């Protein structure tokens, strides 16, 4: 069966044949060459035919033969379609200067400017059209969207509110919610989105936006409820599942997040979803599950090797963990993290000399670049624990040279000075600055207590130690310090309790701690 397009072409060719006359008759002087239509109207018909077929170049060639506003506008339209805006604008300007098809030209020019990102010119043209056609709701909606793009949210709201009741309130309200968000008027945005859902209960984007607004307002339960409502309508709505899982992560509901991410894995083979699940499983201590999830990936990235090493390490499969980490060099983007994990594994294996060598090698690599301060923190701590306190102080001092406000380095130096009862005023200043930056860090709280104790201010020290124990009840040093402070206040029984707890928590209790216990027991 012939198509409509084929029939049109046959008609056009028939007209051409009739116009051309008999083949054996030579053309008259001044007539067009064979194969070229003699009538502008016929040329226009053929040009439109080629345009409808998407034969842009052929259509342009034919339109170019016609010096007429219709052909100018057609060429502008095609140049817009094939993304040649400058050529399109040449014809549009010609139309506007000739005062023909001005409205159509302005509308097309508006779209060209919008595509180019020339929003102000697009707004100017659209405002002219709106003034001419105030009842055209599509133009006014377009203008409102343009104003949102240029952050004229109040102007957009005025236009949109004037459009309510025009027949498409759901989209007007949805766009109005964006203008409200732009003005940081969250209650306004929430109200508009609720009205959208009332009008269009299956309009998914409104649920997603409403959930996000609830989150911005700190209304986590309401956000969860909205996302779940959407999933009741569209159980496989990926964006809603992602939003719900992210909400659970932000509220530390990791198991609930895992459930949602597992649903995502059933809907999508995207490896990033698998990696997200791995991180959640590691967070929740589900190391066997994390191991199984990682190894399901067809292609392993550098990050995957690192996560796999963590899973192995947590399962006490230390040799396998170390083998994975050997694939990650210091020069790679995970060089810092891998070095720290290698050092931790070596320490767990009792290979302390190798652990120290690993940290020293990483420090030598990163410190000239002022990178990976975490290696410096760990190295300083291990040097201090190994009785090489001065070397540890030297590392911390270099960290402070790079960043004088580094809270970890400030705390390290301040604590060492407090422990040695030297430079106490300066130590107090350093620890105070560290605590200002990290007010809930139990180690810094302990350091503040210790410097206050050294300054003979045990009552104040006790306040900080209580906070430190609330934050971290498993650190032996904090409990030993609590015992020292309580003992200085004459509370021997409570002091003994903390000394005993410190001894139980210590892998190798110091002789000094045992002496404190024995003195109180005796």
Model-derived features with residue positions:
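Bacterial N-terminal signal peptides that target proteins for export
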Residues: 1-9
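Hydrophobic helical h-region of N-terminal Sec-dependent signal peptides
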Residues: 9-15
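C-terminal motif of bacterial Sec signal peptides marking the signal peptidase cleavage site
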Residues: 18-21
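Alpha-solenoid helical repeat scaffolds
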Residues: 23-522
């Amino acid at each position: 069966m012939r198509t409509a397009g084929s029939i049109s072409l046959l008609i056009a060719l028939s007209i051409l044949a009739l116009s051309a006359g008999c083949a054996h008759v030579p053309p008259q002087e001044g007539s067009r060459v064979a194969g070229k239509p003699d009538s502008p109207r016929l040329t226009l018909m053929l040009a439109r035919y080629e345009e409808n077929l998407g034969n842009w170049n052929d259509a342009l060639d034919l339109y170019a033969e016609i010096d007429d506003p219709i052909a100018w506008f057609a060429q502008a339209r095609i140049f817009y379609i094939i993304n040649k805006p400058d050529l399109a604008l040449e014809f549009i300007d010609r139309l506007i200067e000739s005062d023909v098809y001005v409205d159509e030209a302005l509308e097309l020019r508006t779209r060209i400017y919008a595509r180019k990102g020339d929003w102000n010119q697009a707004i100017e043209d659209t405002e002219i059209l709106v003034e001419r056609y105030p009842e055209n709701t599509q133009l006014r909606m377009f203008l409102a969207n343009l104003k949102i793009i240029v952050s004229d949210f109040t102007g957009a709201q005025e236009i949109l509110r004037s459009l309510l009741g025009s027949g498409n309130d759901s989209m007007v309200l949805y766009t109005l919610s964006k203008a409200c968000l732009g003005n940081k008027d969250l209650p306004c945005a929430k109200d508009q989105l609720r009205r959208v859902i009332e009008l269009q209960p299956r309009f998914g984007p409104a649920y997603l936006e409403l959930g996000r607004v609830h989150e911005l307002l700190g209304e986590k339960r309401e956000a969860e409820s909205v996302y779940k409502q959407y999933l009741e309508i569209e159980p496989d709505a990926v964006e809603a599942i992602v939003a719900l899982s992210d909400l659970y992560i932000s509220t530390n509901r990791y198991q609930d997040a895992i459930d949602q991410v597992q649903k995502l894995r059933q809907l999508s083979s995207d490896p990033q979803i698998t990696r997200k699940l791995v991180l959640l499983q590691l967070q929740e201590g589900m190391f066997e599950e994390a191991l199984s999830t990682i190894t399901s990936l067809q292609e392993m990235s550098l990050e995957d090797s690192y996560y796999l090493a963590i899973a192995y390490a947590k399962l006490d499969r230390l040799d396998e963990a170390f083998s994975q980490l050997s694939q990650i060099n210091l020069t790679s983007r995970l060089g810092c993290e891998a070095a720290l994990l290698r050092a931790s594994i070596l320490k767990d294996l009792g290979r302390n000399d190798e652990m120290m060598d690993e940290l020293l090698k990483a420090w030598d690599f990163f410190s000239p670049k002022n990178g990976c301060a975490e290696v410096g923190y760990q190295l300083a701590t291990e040097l201090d624990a190994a009785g090489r306190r001065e070397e540890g102080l030297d590392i911390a001092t270099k960290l402070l040279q790079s960043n004088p406000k580094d809270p970890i380095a400030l705390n390290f130096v301040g604590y060492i000075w407090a422990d040695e009862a030297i430079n106490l005023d300066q130590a107090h200043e350093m620890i105070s600055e560290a605590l200002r930056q990290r007010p809930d860090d139990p180690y810094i709280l302990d350091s503040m207590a210790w410097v206050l104790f050294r300054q003979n201010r045990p009552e104040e020290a006790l306040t900080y130690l209580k906070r430190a124990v609330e934050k971290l009840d498993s650190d032996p040093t904090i409990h030993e310090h609590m015992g020292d402070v309580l003992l200085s206040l004459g509370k021997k029984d409570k002091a003994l309790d903390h000394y005993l707890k410190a001894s139980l928590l210590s892998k190798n209790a110091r002789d000094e701690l045992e002496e404190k216990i024995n003195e109180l027991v005796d």
